[in-house]
Structures are given as C-alpha cells and as structure tokens.
Amino acid sequence: MASLIRKIRNRFQPVAPLPAGMHHYQSPPDAPAPYRLHLRLEPDGTGILILNASTVLHLNPTAAECAYLWVKDSTPDQAAKTIASRYRVDRKQALRDYTDFIQRVETLLRTTDLDPVTFLDFDRHDPYSKEISAPYRLDCALTYRLPEGENVHYAPTERVKNELTADDWEKILDKAWAAGIPHVVFTGGEPVLRDDLPALIAHAEKNGQVCGVLSGSPRLGSADYLKTLLDSGLDHLMVLLNPDREESWAAVKTAMQADLATTVHLTLNADLAARGESILDRLRQAEVKWLSLSASDADGAKCLVTLRDRAADRGLSLQWDLPVPYSSANPVSQEIGAPSSGAGKAWLYVEPDGDVLPEQGVNRVLGNFLSDPWETIREKARTK
C-alpha cells in the first residue's frame, strides 16, 4: 500500500528543474553550417540559449530542457525517452515536441538580421519579473566623451573623469562571461571615439557574448568602418538619429545595407514631435525594421504614445530597454531617476571608470566591476 501511495504521489509531483549552470556545445567541424551554443539554466528551470554568440533566446522550462538535451548531444530518441519519463507524456509526443524545438532553433540559426534578443514561447515581460542568477545584459559606457563640436555638458563628464584601458575592459568582459552574462552593449558618450572598439568587440565575440554598439557617430556612414566592426563580431547596432543631419541618415542607410540587426533611436522634443510622422515615413523608406523612442522634454513625452502607434501602423517594431548614449539628442538633464523594472536585475550599467549602476541615469553605485568581487556587486543590486 505504501508503495502504491508513493507511486501516486510521484506521478503528481512537479518536475524538478535541471541543475542551474552554464553548458556549451560546438557543432562538428564537418557540419554543413557550423554553429555554437551556450545555455544558461536558471534555478527555476527556465534558461537562455545563445546562438553563435549573436542571439539570446529566452526559454521556458520545457524549451530549456530540450536545449539542455541538445547541447548534451542526445539523439532525438534519447531526448524523447528522457522527456517522456520526466514529464510523464507519450514518447511519440515528446519526440514531436523535441524535434519541433530543434527545427525552430535551426531556422533561427539560418536567419540573418535576427533580433538579438528573442523570447521563445515566453511572454517578453516574464523574465524581468523573477529572480535570476545573473543579469542578461551588461551596458558598458566606454567613454563619456562626445564628438568635436558637441557641448560636453550633455554627458556627465564632471562626475566621471577617468576611462578604463582596453585591458581593463577585457577583464570586465571576462568577469561578466564567467558570471553568466551573455550580452554586452557598448555605449557612451560616443563609443566610436575609442579606437579600441573593434578589439573589444572581438574579445566579446571570442568569449561567446552577444555584442551590440549604440552610437550616433557619422563614422557609421562609412561602409569600410562598419565592415571593420562587423568583421570584429558586432551583432547588432542602434543608430542614434539626428533627423536634421544628412550624415546621420547616411549612417542609417549604410547600416541597413549591411548584414546587421539595426535599430534606429529617435529622442523626441517639441520640434521633432511635430515632424514625427514624416520622419517615420523616411525611416520606412529606408527599410528600417526596429525603432526606439524616448523624449527629452514634456512636449515630446506627450507625443510618445501617438508616435508609437503611428510607427506600428508603418510596420516598425518598437525596441525597449536599451540605454541611449548621452549626446546633444539625449541630454543628461532629461534622464529619469526612478529605475525601471529590469534595472539591477535584467541588466547593469558600467560607467567609463568601471563603477556599476543599476541602469543608466540611476546614480547609485553598486561597486566597481573591475576591482570589486562580482558577488558583492550582485548582492547590492538585489537589495536595491
């Protein structure tokens, strides 16, 4: 009788999640299209799967289990047997589900210009509402310097006077990777002013990290310079658009001609809000797919919702959560002080001197990423 009760109890007990941790897979050298996978399993059974160091997939527990079996090189039959046993489902159904997952991910592996962050069978807000082992993204402000001719007061140069060296930033990238942070973004100021930007991108690529750059530099209009960044391993780009400068539009055009996931950011003020629809039309003509919006004054803020709707009408997808580089188009005085839901949890922001903030504009120092233990920084972020 006791044995029967145990069997009944076991049948209805929830499936225990797989052990949390990092797992890696490299396809065989003779594979038709070589690829590499990095899987981070969370304590609650969810996970993130990094495809070719270029796309982060957020996975629910079932998808995370399929990914785990895949990176462990299980055959479909072995995977189906394991899933059927753990979830008490028919083995044929388990095989169909596993095969479907693999096919969907393989399709993503073959897709160009893919959104760098994708939520597979996951509501986009779910990952930001739970406890996770490490942030999903590290925003690295390489410098608060601005291009010649821009007012330095648009960036917090008085508060942060020092810049880390390339060696220091490489140590930070390594430390972030060891902590399980899969995605890094280089921002500023103007990150393109750092001559070592291509080398830092290459270092992140070597680690396996997804890497993006946020910039408003006219240098992005140079196909040769953009190719240098791409060849270094750049995965996605956000162009900070100044609609009144043709060199800014040239940067958008060059980025759209490259094999690169590109978002265009527009910071609204009263003047730009009045011209918002014509700007959206020009972006659509340039075949821009992704748009980021913010406001620098009250009039711009009033028009945000309307312009979001107009953007959606034109088929533009809205991107959220990325920091916008300090510049004349995004003045520091307009930064909000209240942290967003993902601040300190889903992402962290590193200033040019290595100090860590919950996010851009929230000036509460959690420690220094270069000199302080990661565990200390993470604990302070959790107790915000």
Task: Outline where the language-model segments fall.
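Basic phosphate/pyrophosphate-binding loop/patch that engages nucleotide-derived ligands
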Residues: 10-19, 257, 284-285, 308-314
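Long, charge-rich, low-complexity alpha-helical segments
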Residues: 3-9, 55-140, 166
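Radical SAM/AdoMet-radical enzyme domain recognition
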Residues: 155, 166-187, 194-300
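Acidic, low-complexity/disordered tracts enriched in E/D and polar residues
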Residues: 1-68, 129-132
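Short, small/polar residue-rich loop motifs at catalytic or cofactor-binding pockets
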Residues: 341-345
